[in-house]
Amino acid sequence: MGKNEAGLDYGAAMRFYGDTLKKLIDLSRQIDMQVNMITSLSSVLLAFSVTQIIQQHEPVTFAVLSVCMVCAVISALFAAHPPRFMRRAGQHQSAMYSKSIARYPSAVEYEAQLRSFLSDADAMVGEYAREIYNLSKYYYIPKRKLYLISRNFFVSGIALATITFITTLLF
């Protein structure tokens, strides 16, 4: 690709951005797997606790567990697909964003736009940087925050249910 006036090697920059984008996608997949695990475990514990409440086995303990597991499942579902207000906060979309692509009337016009980026290395670096920034700030970070909330509800629910169970045994 060559270098610009400042000596920036565009090939190295594109490899760096490609590696950064791959790492970000891998982190997002890891969060998705963790969200799926929390959703599954919380759902199982929720179903178990509801059946125990129905059978009148330690209703207070299982009510506490149920409430926390409902909150864990809901926040995990939001982590799987964060709400729009967390994902889109008026950021400038890159040309690689699917809705930006759909705005072009034809594939030929989109191709022309991509070719203009390929002919202008600074514009290509800018688009790559914008895409990485948007994915990180408006996709990965909201998913991570919601996953942590879900995990905290899950752990808190188990801890509170355990404390409630021990308390009911002692008193």
Question: Where do the protein language model's features map onto the residues?
Answer:
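Short, extreme N-terminal leader segments that mark the start of a protein/domain
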Residues: 1-23
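Hydrophobic alpha-helical transmembrane segments and immediately flanking/interface helices
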Residues: 127-154
